[in-house]
Amino acid sequence: MRLRHVVSSLDLTRDDYFRIFELADKFSNVKKLNYLSGKVVSLAFFEPSTRTAQSFHTAAIKLGADVIGFASEESTSIAKGENLADTIRMLNNYSNCIVMRHKFDGAALFASEISDIPIINAGDGKHEHPTQALIDLYTIYKVFGEIDGRTFGLLGDLKYARTVNSLLRALTRFKPKKVFLISPSQLKVRREILDGLNYPVIETENPYDVIQDIDVLYVTRIQKERFVDEVEYEKVKESYVVDLKLVNMMKKDGIILHPLPRVTEIDRKVDKTTNAKYFYQASLAVPVRMALFYEVLGERKDD
């Protein structure tokens, strides 16, 4: 069955995840296909993006779709006072799918409630980034051959990082052994996220206490743009640095992921270790997003 909107990681079932992984495998080495020939994808980026916007653009083109859109709110009629609802309605007239990034929590859900075409959430405020979670899980699946039974450690800004929210919610579709949440007390995962999880979670501030148990260390930068108070940001901006000392305490086959961009939270010396998989992770963005586009827009025998 074709997917409709993808606003949250919870919009995907376990079967959806594995079906997308299988498609991503098939799309990994293709140059150009015509599966979406005649379709138009709108990239509605009300908030700046490099990797996400470019990988979605590339994914659409490689499937044969045409791409329209904008890269900032300033280049749209919203700068003239148009409301978001009207912008979404106008994009419905021009395209078959809208990939949307916005600075406000819940913007993608709002858009999905008024849109007649699929909305794919490319990040909304500090809320969610479900396609990044798809890439994260696909990376883990490619490295280990499975996701169930693994121990995760999420480190850094767990309060404002939307990638963290999406990954935690996506893991409810799997069976992680446990998840360590490693952050300063000011940047702990929000209660409404924790309350929806169905697996063991342990909160700590010290990565050295748990690093030996972790299969997947997921590192996030401190989200400066989400802080209202600059003083609070300055207090926590360099809370953690993943360096060789920490990495050398990991399991030999443990991996380090990061949604990027990286600032100072991973020492560049770590890049050369076998544990560092964040650039490999980034390389999987295009086939995963191709697979998602195909699930949302591709022709189906059962349509």
Swiss-Prot record:
Ordered alphabetically, the record's keywords are: Pyrimidine biosynthesis, Transferase
Q: Which InterPro entries match?
A: Asp/Orn_carbamoyltranf_P-bd, Asp/Orn_carbamoylTrfase, Asp/Orn_carbamoylTrfase_sf, Asp_carbamoyltransf, Asp_carbamoyltransf_Asp/Orn-bd
Which Enzyme Commission number(s) are listed?
2.1.3.2
Matching entries from PANTHER family are given as: ASPARTATE CARBAMOYLTRANSFERASE (PTHR45753:SF6), ORNITHINE CARBAMOYLTRANSFERASE, MITOCHONDRIAL (PTHR45753)
The record's section on NCBIfam families has: asp_carb_tr (TIGR00670), PRK00856.1 (NF002032)
Q: Which HAMAP family match?
A: Asp_carb_tr
Family the UniProt entry places it in = Belongs to the aspartate/ornithine carbamoyltransferase superfamily. ATCase family.
Q: What is this protein called?
A: Aspartate carbamoyltransferase catalytic subunit
